[in-house]
From Swiss-Prot:
Record flagged with keyword Transport: yes
Record protein name field: Large-conductance mechanosensitive channel
InterPro entries attached to this UniProt entry: Mechanosensitive_channel_CS (IPR019823), MS_channel (IPR001185), MSC/AndL (IPR037673), MscL_channel (IPR036019)
Family as reported in the entry's similarity comment: Belongs to the MscL family.
Domain of life of the source: Bacteria
Its membrane topology: Multi-pass membrane protein
Organism of origin: Pseudomonas putida (strain GB-1)
Protein location: Cell inner membrane
HAMAP family: MscL (MF_00115)
An MF annotation (GO) of this entry: mechanosensitive monoatomic ion channel activity
GO CC terms: plasma membrane
């Protein structure tokens, strides 16, 4: 039973829950970006290049024989995946940059020194009076 309680304590910590939410949102964001690249960016880009569908771009290394499928290098799908990665990496970069800017602004905000208590003020005055008396006694 002890291990189960330890696991519960670990699983409900803020960092673990935050990480799980981040992974789920990241997976959903990845699907959105893949759709954006495949359905919105690549068709016009293929049209500009000459009516090319990037997902069909491939080099056939060995033709299909009977039930054995062809061996191909699907470089069009690779190009789409690279564009997916660049968009996701850029979005993450912009998010981290914004978070770092907010952290910097919080760190730069000046803090006012705490107001000394009445006891501290009294002790400071006594110290200053003793210093003055000691300076007056010295020849």
């Amino acid at each position: 039973m002890g291990m189960l309680n330890e696991f519960k304590a670990f699983a409900v910590k803020g960092n673990v829950v935050d990480m799980a939410v981040g992974i789920i949102i990241g997976a959903a964001f990845g699907k959105i970006v893949s759709s954006f690249v495949g359905d919105v960016i690549m068709p016009p880009l293929g049209l500009l290049i000459g009516g090319v569908d990037f997902s069909d771009l491939a080099i056939t290394l060995k033709a299909a024989e009977g039930d054995v499928p062809a061996v191909v290098l699907a470089y069009g799908k690779f190009i789409q995946t690279v564009i997916d990665f660049v968009i996701v990496a850029f979005a993450i970069f912009m998010g981290v940059k914004a978070i770092n800017r907010l952290k910097r602004e919080e760190a730069v905000a000046p803090t006012t020194p705490p107001v000394p208590s009445a006891e501290e003020t009294l002790l400071t005055e006594i110290r200053d009076l003793l210093k003055t008396q000691n300076q007056n006694r010295l020849p």
